[in-house]
Amino acid sequence: MDLSPRNRPLLDSSSLDSGSLTSLDSSVFCSEGEGEPLALGDCLTVNVGGSRFVLSQQALSCFPHTRLGKLAVVVASYRRLGALAAAPSPLELCDDANPVDNEYFFDRSSQAFRYVLHYYRTGRLHVMEQLCALSFLQEIQYWGIDELSIDSCCRDRYFRRKELSETLDFKKDTDDQESQHESEQDFSQGPCPTVRQKLWDILEKPGSSTAARIFGVISIIFVAVSIVNMALMSAELSWLNLQLLEILEYVCISWFTGEFILRFLCVKDRCHFLRKVPNIIDLLAILPFYITLLVESLSGSHTTQELENVGRLVQVLRLLRALRMLKLGRHSTGLRSLGMTITQCYEEVGLLLLFLSVGISIFSTIEYFAEQSIPDTTFTSVPCAWWWATTSMTTVGYGDIRPDTTTGKIVAFMCILSGILVLALPIAIINDRFSACYFTLKLKEAAVRQREALKKLTKNIATDSYISVNLRDIYARSIMEMLRLKGRERASTRSSGGDDFWF
């Protein structure tokens, strides 16, 4: 499309509302200057996305670091010196120009430009409510306005949304790379490609078939039984059959081992497989059992002292069996969202620990010196006071160490109050991040189910077999599920004070 001035349709003042910001008869800058209106030659017309704005060059020159400020300087230089001016060409700052009518064209959003226009009028930049933070950032960067110029009333909302958008974009890119890597699993190389493909779908895609769903349920049952069995083995009750519990432990470990080996044999890139967090958790869940068997089998010919050391090692290894609980993360969106939230909020968590450490150090020292002179006091040292300050600031309050003096109780009250305030600071950020991660995973699961259904439909069409999948139903279900998730996300944000507070 030719955008040259001779072929571009120009809007005259009759086609615009005389009271609007885009009217040529009522310029926002060509008003009164020193008692008289500015001449038309002192103004320039800016056409942004088809909307025309008449701006004062003098007012634009007050913002020389912006694109329009630079354009005003260039236009003024060309008027004085003509083509011999040392300034750059106006076409370096705009998409097209009509020097005859002094009109300059920009292929940008006219809606976003109204906020830029308000910045030139008042020196205050406000954020669009209808536009995402990253898109608004692109617009103001194009016009040469720094995001630090955003007014204080919109600054918190803008940076909060920008951080959330950047986090979700980074997570989306990571998930896309993971999905691409998984989709590129080449099962054609190696033995039994069809069997490996079907087995991989059963192991890694619980919603792909009835067999996959049954396998997922059985896996969850084995995890739950293993955890309960581990707890019963430590109870040492007289009515429990320890031999039966040991047999049950062997059965659960055999299931976990077979599940891990099948996953390992199905994949092509086994180094990448071993680096993934879910597979590391699976490996840590079964290794302590085999290491314990190995240690116990090799401890027969050792001395008593060595046997005691081996016993301690075995006890530590048995504690690692609690990691089996993390295997539920394969089947729980909430657990995966919790892991993502902790990973993404490490700065907030670190800041929380720093605040707690400072408070514990201060209040424990004060409390120790306030209580040390009391007979039979429980504050025997500063480390003991650390334990008291920790339980008090986290509002646990075991009661094993407590103050007896009035001064100590006042300090305890201040410690508890400061703990409540410190713990409440990052909760809103972590809650928003958890909600965003949860609904992102839900949308991803919906997209995966839709993709699997489309693959099944494509395969049926290619083999001329009976088509049991309706494409329209797949699309309708996916859209309805996404709308439902988006509605829940908005309701969650509103209930946590998100949009209602910021808007």
Swiss-Prot record:
It is a multi-pass membrane protein. One of its GO terms (molecular function) is potassium channel activity. Belongs to the potassium channel family. V (TC 1.A.1.2) subfamily. Kv8.1/KCNV1 sub-subfamily. InterPro entries: BTB/POZ_dom (IPR000210), Ion_trans_dom (IPR005821), K_chnl_volt-dep_Kv (IPR003968), K_chnl_volt-dep_Kv8.1 (IPR003970), SKP1/BTB/POZ_sf (IPR011333), T1-type_BTB (IPR003131), VG_K_chnl (IPR028325), Volt_channel_dom_sf (IPR027359). Potassium channel subunit that does not form functional channels by itself. Modulates KCNB1 and KCNB2 channel activity by shifting the threshold for inactivation to more negative values and by slowing the rate of inactivation. Can down-regulate the channel activity of KCNB1, KCNB2, KCNC4 and KCND1, possibly by trapping them in intracellular membranes. Heteromultimer with KCNB1 and KCNB2. Interacts with KCNC4 and KCND1. The segment S4 is probably the voltage-sensor and is characterized by a series of positively charged amino acids at every third position. The chain crosses the membrane at residues 214-234, 242-262, 280-300, 313-334, 349-369, 410-430. A motif (Selectivity filter) lies at residues 395-400. This is Potassium voltage-gated channel subfamily V member 1. Residues 1-20, 171-192 are annotated as: Disordered. It is found in: Cell membrane. The keyword Electron transport does not apply. Its main location: membrane. Keywords: Cell membrane, Ion channel, Ion transport, Membrane, Potassium, Potassium channel, Potassium transport, Transmembrane, Transmembrane helix, Transport, Voltage-gated channel. GO terms for cellular component: membrane; voltage-gated potassium channel complex. SMART domains: BTB. It comes from the Eukaryota. The keyword Ubl conjugation does not apply. Detected in brain, in neocortex, olfactory tubercle, hippocampus, dentate gyrus, piriform cortex and amygdala. Detected in Purkinje cells and granular cells of the cerebellum, in hippocampal CA4 neurons and neocortex pyramidal cells. Residues 3-213, 263-279, 335-348, 431-503 are cytoplasmic.
